[in-house]
Amino acid sequence: MSVLYGIAAATVTATASFLLTAVLAALLRAPALRLAVVDRRRRRPVPLLGGVAVVLVTAVVAWAGDRAGVVPLGPAAGRLLAAATVVGALGLAADVWRLRRRWLLAGTAVAAACVVPYGETGPVAGALAVGWVALVTGAFRGLDHADGVVGTVGVVTAFGVGACAAVELMDGPAVLLLVLAAALAGFLLHNWHPARIALGACGSLFTGFLLTGAAVLARTGYGPVGGAGVLCALTAVPVADAVLVLLSRRLAGRPLSRGGPDHLAHRLRRLGLTAQGVVVVLGGAALCAVVVGVLAHTGRVGGQAALWVAGGAAAGVLGLLRVRVYGPARLRRGAGVRAPVRRAGRGARAWAVVRRPRTAMRRARAGVSQAPRGATGAAGGASFRAAIFPVRQATSTENVQVGAPLRVRNG
């Protein structure tokens, strides 16, 4: 009877979480638009308060179940839920006031330090766990760049980590992750393409922190090498997305904190996949990796199975790095800005380099020497000056075309 009672209680709790999140997310869309809490990086502004619905419903349903004695959480899951709620509040502040990433990372690390069980992991492994939780939580936030991606990956990962917790007889974290999975499923009703509302930093950080923190709790007591392999398998998709973004920006010479269309979903869309197809591919990849992680955690497969997941993720990252997402390559430092000018007496255009005066002088002399016979010295001098200072005032029928992103006006 106790088993049947537990199944019935979990089913009722998950159903309530699903329905409440679906209703609350729909209600929060209008206030988000009215307060201009929207994501403007997409083709159309998308409200960002969907994460508030996920955080509130998950916390309230789990707390109510614990208070009623239906699904007791226990002290470890209670601390995890409280810390995740604080991280979600920090993410909400980032959605409203655009906090810097360093503050989000620092706040997430402080919250993770309050959750990791140092008595069982030790100080060194505990510090590594804190760093891993903070970084992978930020990686989950990076998944919130396309419709349905972070919700789908979050649901799959929640079931996987919940299964690992259930194997360890950790009923509190298992029930908490079931409630989270149901809340994300209810949210996906509004986040499927075309999305009517998005998680934002609030929901994505809350989801990532809850999943990574529960995974650390479930793997406590195991060896560090095997534990790291299982943790990476459970979170393979967000980790691969973060590695892909960091590598591509580093190789392109872009600042790491500068956003761009360089995530997994963006590159898959450039390969021809639809928005729904991208969600299916990433969800399937997350499912395969999570299944391997759960089997490795239970001992059904050896620890080397995680290496296959890492190898597949590395191959995918290297393959997607070849997809161009930044457009034409930037001009190298010192190469100068080229601008087209007309030679005196001719219709052809000559290119002069603004930032390299010697090159401009040589090309200007060549242009003067090729001028037609009979041209006056004033015309030759005008061509010479125009090549050195190529930007000029456009007439009513001409437009100055500058071959660089920067436009310069004559003072």
UniProtKB/Swiss-Prot annotation:
GO molecular function annotation: phosphotransferase activity, for other substituted phosphate groups
Which BP terms does GO give this entry? cell wall macromolecule biosynthetic process; cell wall organization; lipopolysaccharide biosynthetic process
So which domain of life are we looking at? Bacteria
Q: What is the lineage of its organism?
A: Bacteria, Bacillati, Actinomycetota, Actinomycetes, Kitasatosporales
- Primary place of residence? membrane
Under CDD domains, the record lists: GT_WecA_like
Give the EC number(s) under which this enzyme is classified: 2.-.-.-
Q: Which residues cross the membrane?
A: 7-27, 45-65, 70-90, 120-140, 148-168, 169-189, 197-217, 227-247, 277-297, 301-321
What protein family does this chain belong to? Belongs to the glycosyltransferase 4 family.
Q: Does the keyword Nucleotide-binding apply?
A: no
Q: Which Pfam families does this chain map to?
A: Glycos_transf_4
- Protein name per the record: Putative glycosyltransferase SCO3672
Keywords, sorted A to Z: Cell membrane, Membrane, Transferase, Transmembrane, Transmembrane helix
Gene Ontology CC terms = plasma membrane
Please tell me which top-level EC class this enzyme sits in.
Answer: transferase
